[in-house]
């Protein structure tokens, strides 16, 4: 049969021929278009073609009523797939599966990239139903929306970066110009004048329907995107329910189980008795939402005979927006699945045993062995193939949600992957951007595959019970493989054997069997027996269990030894065995991979089990452990925690290489990674993505830490041991693995898995790590976190978990540091990593991470990690970092750790992490941990940390490291990657970047002095009076563009920056506050203040500091200075920290050597230049009035005379005294002075002694001193008097009011009120003759309801146009349009633009505002002088005429201007005609002028040839 694509037909064998198209495309009326003479736009043609070829909506059912497969492309309409409702799935029925939300465009002949490009550019006809309002593009984010479709380069592309869409012309926004420069040539005039935006709907993912299951034709996914491959829809053959021609509303497919009988699958037949338990059976119709490539069709056919587990509809729900899913239904399904599994399990056990034995015999961890095993596995070829198929690449991650699986997890026999499959999977991982995201729920809370009778319970984190979302794995629900590994029902004996049987001989497996049975059964039975386990911790998921699930594909060599019992014991043995193991197993990457997977997976189970089973297992462990070990079994994983380091290395490496493939498969396979969503096992996979690995390891560590706070100490140990093991025991091994991991991670999964994993792991780890970090922190700072630690359960589990987490953290941190060291020296990177990790941990303690930020960070981290540095550096850095971190962590006192670590780490890591590419992943994990630790540490710790950090900041990196480490070191290295993003240590604490972005070197300062003058005041009054220095107010008038100013959030962590930000409502105030650095959420104040002013600010600040002498180099963190420091930073910082980092980087790129960045060099530099910075900052700065005055001068909106001169908000008298300072400015100044920026609380107490403030204020890099009114420094007194003189001094209540949340509009209103009060302007108009009043310092525009111009008489216009065009050249003329600001006029102008732009050779400007200087009357003398000069000739006039200046402020008007140029006279005449038509309609609001340009030329040179050609022909022909 033919499945029709957009431009191609894929031949697919199918029982049903496609019936002809039954649907008309509602979007394009084909009659008009087919008959129109204009050539068809390819998009429209494509649409028509699609309609003609789209598959039939009514496929007759097969006569036998057996289920027939359908491809999504066959579903009713390719253009508009119906919205298949999840509602009509009855809760008791097995869930109806709807076709995938997107129907990928499978082009057999194009690469993914080209197909992607093509599909982006081709019209995907979306139903107008799904279009948001034409003025409100989805999320404002579409590439083409009503505003910018015509001009992809438009600055409105991302409408102001706001997260909420704005209608086009909210209040006085500029009139949008529609640039048709990229329009297809063949759309008709009507189509351009009334474009149908639905065609250009960029992205169905932005669909506003919550349960978007609509299929769209091309989602540019190719043959290999199969993660959503099988969605089961009960396909009704009843024509009533098939989508009818009316697509204007999505029709829901109805489930009619009576009409279609379920074809009983073979497995189903085997398990008929179990199927009775299912409440109802809905038809298992499989609709493939991809167009299978030919080589996959056979697999597909086979799959139809097996039970295919589709992705749960809710699988992706964690991605976010689709929260409307009926989670209760899923709960029920879970329960049902579990119960069915119990019964199913027994039948499959025998097979599993057989398989296990077979694997034990045949298993060699080599690829050839994999093939061999595959050959051994005749019985379930079909199932295996099906599994492979299901493993094909996941569809794009953003898929909203997939239907939940109807089938209870089908029991599949063990599946063996061939090398080609592994390769394919690897490739797929690399390919799909979110390879894991769809498949794997990383959170340890979503252990998906039921393993034993308790399987769900076992893998279900107790916390998950309340969170149905978490219950479903994000990815395809893994069908329960009855691999020995995945089958929860097989005997523990088998599981253990299989797990153990990495390389083991038969005898090994046998030997290990009894012990493993013991352990496995013990753990499993304990699970069953002790329901408490669920409550206490993730059910032990005995290592065996984990192994079972994690190594769902045992073939991949991911046999996990039953690490349950051994994990505790393994902690002890880890060092010993680690060496042996590394020596023993270096050859079997499979083993390593297994170990890593096992260990990662096992971290959770391990910690849990440890909690529950420590005593039991200790006795049991030793024998099996030694047996297994002797047999070269991969038991080292048994010492999951101990070996955790090894596996961590191996995880990073093997996992990255093999696990990326294997884990990918496993994930898809329902491998425990998926089913458990073990962050640990996932971590193994993530390790392939260096960035993610950080997070993952963090999550592992967190999970370990879940159990106990010991993690931090363990982390210390683990890091030490890790460094010991990694360095000493097996350098070559670690090297190989590091290389492998670097390669694999950067290559294979870096992007896809990193994003998915980062998301999943960020979530999972956020939970786990929150717990872990709180506990870890609790250990480190026993006092601060005593609360958190109190929760921790048994000692053994804490030990094991702490060790595992420490190992994971050391691993992650070492890897992160390795990456960082790729840039800085390995030594620097080690510091960086420890710093970064400590910072991450501090961050973790600092605040709960927002989901979005974690996602973003994960994305960034994946990118960064993929960029990861060379192996050597990674190795060295990992060692160094592990050493440093272990040292630091061991050393850190409980108190210092929480405080200093958060502070110092934030500072050091900020410096290092700004460099470290690993930033994001660490951020995710740290964020997760931050949640817990923030909870645990609470405010006291934040205060303490601020103090400690100020202390620590002065100290050497080692001190910082030590202090830092106490925070979960799990994050330590992880955080290294992620740090840059997280700028806040605590939700209350603000962290200072150790990496000073201020102008830090004397050379820089001197250069600035040289360039800017010592006062940085080269503009004197003029700059202050020019609105361009008042932050471009005239161009971005917030009064008319309120969306640019959102309401200020109350500054929570009030650094002086915060209070400033809240107080300095005025544009850039806070922007310049160095602390703004910590509020990386850069709210672009008014479209950003002019760069000049900001640079001046910075320079002045640095200058002032330098001059202060005590503080030669204050870190003026540029980025923060630029941000509107709204210091509820915990939320904002996460999002913008990456941005801030990049800003900082870019800022420093030129000025500083990268070495300066390395924490160490930077620190040394800073230490040399300044005495302990923290001290100098807090004390010297605060205390030296001199400095303060300079500082104030540096701060734009603080009123000092200098400031006033530079950027006065007030009307400056010509004498530059600026004594009439803006009331508002003064108020701001006072607020800034007064706000006690205390550490944890925003106090409105205006008067606070500066000393207290300095002590309290968290930020040690305070560029701006909190100047309280009590301050006696000269500058403040000057300010005080100035305020008195201005007569607008605020009362305290007024100030506190402003300090409280003021909307920008309110702020502007007050400011205007004060200004008006000065000039006694109350209401109404100001006389146009009173220039001083008119040109006061205000941000209001001159408003004109009517244009202050007369219409251009049409006759004159015609004559003027005729004259300009009479010589055959039109480039000496232009048309100027003036128009007022109103919605109606804006619409007219847009229409005019559109009409102009469909003509050739026309250039239209965007509407722009004008800035106006005050008028000035010249006296007779000046005019006489001018006349005299004029008489002397042009040169004299030019040379001798004096410049005249004014001392008022500029104003802008809301009259807008637009210019039109035409390249040829024909176009000029037509443009004039068009413009005049619109000007005549609104003569009082739109005025046209024609102007001639002396020596005019075309706007751009591309028209020159056209103009010349026209002119030559014109002249030639006119002579004829």
From Swiss-Prot:
Keywords: Activator, DNA-binding, Host nucleus, Host-virus interaction, Repeat, Transcription, Transcription regulation. Residues 131-141, 424-433 have a biased composition (Basic residues). GO terms for molecular function: DNA binding. Residues 1-67, 115-162, 239-290, 340-406, 418-571, 583-611, 640-987, 1033-1278 are annotated as: Disordered. It is found in: Host nucleus. Residues 16-30, 50-67, 148-157, 239-249, 278-290, 480-489, 550-571, 600-611, 640-654, 663-685, 710-727, 955-973, 1158-1167, 1210-1219 have a biased composition (Polar residues). GO terms for cellular component: host cell nucleus. GO terms for biological process: regulation of DNA-templated transcription. Transmembrane segments: none annotated. Residues 115-130, 260-273, 358-391, 450-470, 510-535, 1175-1188 have a biased composition (Basic and acidic residues). Residues 1024-1072 are annotated as: Interaction with human UBE2I. Residues 250-259, 686-701, 746-953, 1059-1076, 1089-1105, 1124-1140 have a biased composition (Low complexity). Belongs to the herpesviridae IE2 family. Interacts with human UBE2I in the nucleus. Although this interaction does not promote IE2 sumoylation, it represses transactivation activity. Transcriptional transactivator. This is Immediate-early protein 2. It comes from Human herpesvirus 6B (strain Z29) (HHV-6 variant B). The lineage of its organism: Viruses, Duplodnaviria, Heunggongvirae, Peploviricota, Herviviricetes.
């Amino acid at each position: 049969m033919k499945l029709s694509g957009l431009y191609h037909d894929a031949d697919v064998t199918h029982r049903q021929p496609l019936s002809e198209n039954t649907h008309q495309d509602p979007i394009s009326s084909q009659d008009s278009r087919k008959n129109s003479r204009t050539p068809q736009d390819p998009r429209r043609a494509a649409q028509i073609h699609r309609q003609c070829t789209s598959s039939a909506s009514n496929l007759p059912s097969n006569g036998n009523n057996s289920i027939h497969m359908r491809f999504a492309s066959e579903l009713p309409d390719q253009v508009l797939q119906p919205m298949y409702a999840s509602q009509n799935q009855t809760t008791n029925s097995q869930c109806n599966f709807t076709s995938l939300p997107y129907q990928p465009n499978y082009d057999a002949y194009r690469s993914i990239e080209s197909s992607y490009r093509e599909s982006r550019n081709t019209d995907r006809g979306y139903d107008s139903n799904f279009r948001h309002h034409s003025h409100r593009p989805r999320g404002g984010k579409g590439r083409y929306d009503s505003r910018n479709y015509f001009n992809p380069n438009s600055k409105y592309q991302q409408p102001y970066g706001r997260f909420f869409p704005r209608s086009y012309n909210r209040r006085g926004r500029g009139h949008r110009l529609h640039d048709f420069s990229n329009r297809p040539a063949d759309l008709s005039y009507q189509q351009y004048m009334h474009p149908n935006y639905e065609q250009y709907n960029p992205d169905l993912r932005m669909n506003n329907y919550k349960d978007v299951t609509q299929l769209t034709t091309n989602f540019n996914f190719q043959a290999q995107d199969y993660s959503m491959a099988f969605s089961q829809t009960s396909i009704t053959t009843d024509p009533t329910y098939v989508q009818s021609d009316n697509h204007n509303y999505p029709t829901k497919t109805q489930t009619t189980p009576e009409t279609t009988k379920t074809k009983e699958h073979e497995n189903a037949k085997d398990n008929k008795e179990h199927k009775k338990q299912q409440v109802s059976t809905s038809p298992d119709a499989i609709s493939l939402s991809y167009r299978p490539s030919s080589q996959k069709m056979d697999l597909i056919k086979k799959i139809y005979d097996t039970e295919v587990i589709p992705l749960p509809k809710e699988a992706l729900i964690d991605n976010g927006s689709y929260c409307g899913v009926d989670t209760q239904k899923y709960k029920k399904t879970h329960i049902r699945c579990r119960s069915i599994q119990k019964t199913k399990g027994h039948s499959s056990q025998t097979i599993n045993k057989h398989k296990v034995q077979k694997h034990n015999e045949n298993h060699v961890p080599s690829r050839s062995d994999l093939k061999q095993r595959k050959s051994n596995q005749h019985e379930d070829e079909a199932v295996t193939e099906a599994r492979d198929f299901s493993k094909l690449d996941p569809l794009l991650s953003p898929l909203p949600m997939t239907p939940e699986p109807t089938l209870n997890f089908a029991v599949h026999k063990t599946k063996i992957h061939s090398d080609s499959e592994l390769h394919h999977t690897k490739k797929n991982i690399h390919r799909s951007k979110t390879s894991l995201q769809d498949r794997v729920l990383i959170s340890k809370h979503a252990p998906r595959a039921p393993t034993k009778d308790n399987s769900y319970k076992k893998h279900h984190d107790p916390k998950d019970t309340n969170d149905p979302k978490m219950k479903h794995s994000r990815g395809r629900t893994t069908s329960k493989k009855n691999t020995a590994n995945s089958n929860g029902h097989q005997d523990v004996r088998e599981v253990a054997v299989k797990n153990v049987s990495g390389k083991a001989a038969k005898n090994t497996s046998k030997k290990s069997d009894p012990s493993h049975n013991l352990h496995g059964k013990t753990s499993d039975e304990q699970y069953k027996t002790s329901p408490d386990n669920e409550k206490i911790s993730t059910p032990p998921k005995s290592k065996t269990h984990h192994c079972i699930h994690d190594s769902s594909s045992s073939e991949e060599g991911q046999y996990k030894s039953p690490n349950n019992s051994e994990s505790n014991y393994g902690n002890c043995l880890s060092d010993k065995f680690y060496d042996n193991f590394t020596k023993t197993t270096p050859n079997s990457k499979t083993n390593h991979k297994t170990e890593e997977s096992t260990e990662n997976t096992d971290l959770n189970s391990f910690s849990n089990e440890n909690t529950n089973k420590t005593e039991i297992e200790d006795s049991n462990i030793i024998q099996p452990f030694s047996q297994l070990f002797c047999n070269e079994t991969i038991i080292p994983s048994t010492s999951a925690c101990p070996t955790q380091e090894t596996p961590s290395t191996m995880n990073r490496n093997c996992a990255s290489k093999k696990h990326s493939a294997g884990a990918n498969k496993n994930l898809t396979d329902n491998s425990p990674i998926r089913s458990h969503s073990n962050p640990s096992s996932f971590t193994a996979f993530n390790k392939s993505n260096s960035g993610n690995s950080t997070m993952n390891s963090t999550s592992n560590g967190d999970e370990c830490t879940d159990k106990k706070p010991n993690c931090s100490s363990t982390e210390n140990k683990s890091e030490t041991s890790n460094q010991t093991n990694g360095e000493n025991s097996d350098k070559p091994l670690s090297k190989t693995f590091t290389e492998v991991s670097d390669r694999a991670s950067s290559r294979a999964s870096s992007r896809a898995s990193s994003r998915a994993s980062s998301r999943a792991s960020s979530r999972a780890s956020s939970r786990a790590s929150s717990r872990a970090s709180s506990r870890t922190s609790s250990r480190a700072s026993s006092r601060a976190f005593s609360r958190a630690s109190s929760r921790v359960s048994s000692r053994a589990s804490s030990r094991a978990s702490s060790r595992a987490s420490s190992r994971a953290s050391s691993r992650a941190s070492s890897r992160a540091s390795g990456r960082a060291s790729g840039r800085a020296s390995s030594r620097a990177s080690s510091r960086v990593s420890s710093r970064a990790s400590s910072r991450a941990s501090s961050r973790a303690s600092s605040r709960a991470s927002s989901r979005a930020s974690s996602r973003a960070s994960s994305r960034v981290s994946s990118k960064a990690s993929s960029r990861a540095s060379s192996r050597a550096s990674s190795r060295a850095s990992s060692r160094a970092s592990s050493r440093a971190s272990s040292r630091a962590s061991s050393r850190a006192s409980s108190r210092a750790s929480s405080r200093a670590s958060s502070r110092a780490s934030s500072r050091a890591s900020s410096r290092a992490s700004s460099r470290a590419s690993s930033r994001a992943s660490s951020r995710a994990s740290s964020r997760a941990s931050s949640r817990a630790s923030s909870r645990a540490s609470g405010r006291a710790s934040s205060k303490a940390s601020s103090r400690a950090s100020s202390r620590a900041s002065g100290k050497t990196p080692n001190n910082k490291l030590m202090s830092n480490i106490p925070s979960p070191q799990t994050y330590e290295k992880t955080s290294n990657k992620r740090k840059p993003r997280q700028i806040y240590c605590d939700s209350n604490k603000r962290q200072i970047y150790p990496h000073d972005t201020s102008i830090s070197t004397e050379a820089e300062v001197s250069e600035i002095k040289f360039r800017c003058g010592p006062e940085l005041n080269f503009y004197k009054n003029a700059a202050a009076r020019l609105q361009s220095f008042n932050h471009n107010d005239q161009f971005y008038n917030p009064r008319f563009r309120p969306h640019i100013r959102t309401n200020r959030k109350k500054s929570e962590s009030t650094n002086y920056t915060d209070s400033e930000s809240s107080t300095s409502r005025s544009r850039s105030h806070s922007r310049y506050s160095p602390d703004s650095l910590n509020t990386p959420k850069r709210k672009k104040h008014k479209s950003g203040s002019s760069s000049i002013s900001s640079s001046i600010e910075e320079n002045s600040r640095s200058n002032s500091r330098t001059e202060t002498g005590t503080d030669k180099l204050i870190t003026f963190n540029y980025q923060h200075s630029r941000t509107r420091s709204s210091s509820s930073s915990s939320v904002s910082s996460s999002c913008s920290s990456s941005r801030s980092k990049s800003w900082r980087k870019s800022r420093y790129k030129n000025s500083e050597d990268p070495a300066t960045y390395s924490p160490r060099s930077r620190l040394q530099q800073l230490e040399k230049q300044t005495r302990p910075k923290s001290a100098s900052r807090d004390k010297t700065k605060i205390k030296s009035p001199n400095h303060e005055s300079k500082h104030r001068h540096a701060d734009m909106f603080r009123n000092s005379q200098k400031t006033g001169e530079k950027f006065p908000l007030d009307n400056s008298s010509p004498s530059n005294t600026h004594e009439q300072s803006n009331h508002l400015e003064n108020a701001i100044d006072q607020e800034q002075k007064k706000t006690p920026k205390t550490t944890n609380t925003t106090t409105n107490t205006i008067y606070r002694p500066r000393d207290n403030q300095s002590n309290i204020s968290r930020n040690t890099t305070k560029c701006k001193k909190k100047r309280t009114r009590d301050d006696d420094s000269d500058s403040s007194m000057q300010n005080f008097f100035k305020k008195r003189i201005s007569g607008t001094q605020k009362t305290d209540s007024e100030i506190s009011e402003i300090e409280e949340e003021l909307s920008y509009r309110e702020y502007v209103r007050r400011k205007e009120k004060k200004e008006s009060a000065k000039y006694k302007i109350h209401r109404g108009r100001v006389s146009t003759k009173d220039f001083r009043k008119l040109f006061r310092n205000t941000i209001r525009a001159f408003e004109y309801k009517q244009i202050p111009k007369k219409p251009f008489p049409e006759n004159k216009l015609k004559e003027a146009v005729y004259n300009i065009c009479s010589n055959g050249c039109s480039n000496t003329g232009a048309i100027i349009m003036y128009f007022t600001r109103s919605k109606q006029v804006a619409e007219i102008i847009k229409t005019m633009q559109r009409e102009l732009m469909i003509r050739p050779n026309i250039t239209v400007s965007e509407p722009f505002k004008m800035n106006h200087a005050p008028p000035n009357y010249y006296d007779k003398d000046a005019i006489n002088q001018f006349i005299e000069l004029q008489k002397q000739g042009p040169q004299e006039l030019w040379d001798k005429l004096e410049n005249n200046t004014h001392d008022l402020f500029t104003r802008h008007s809301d009259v807008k201007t637009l210019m039109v140029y035409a390249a040829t006279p024909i176009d000029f005449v037509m443009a004039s005609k068009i413009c005049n038509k619109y000007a005549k309609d609104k003569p009082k609001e739109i005025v046209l002028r024609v102007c001639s340009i002396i020596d005019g030329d075309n706007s751009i040179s591309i028209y020159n040839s056209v103009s010349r050609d026209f002119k030559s022909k014109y002249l030639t022909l006119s002579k004829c």
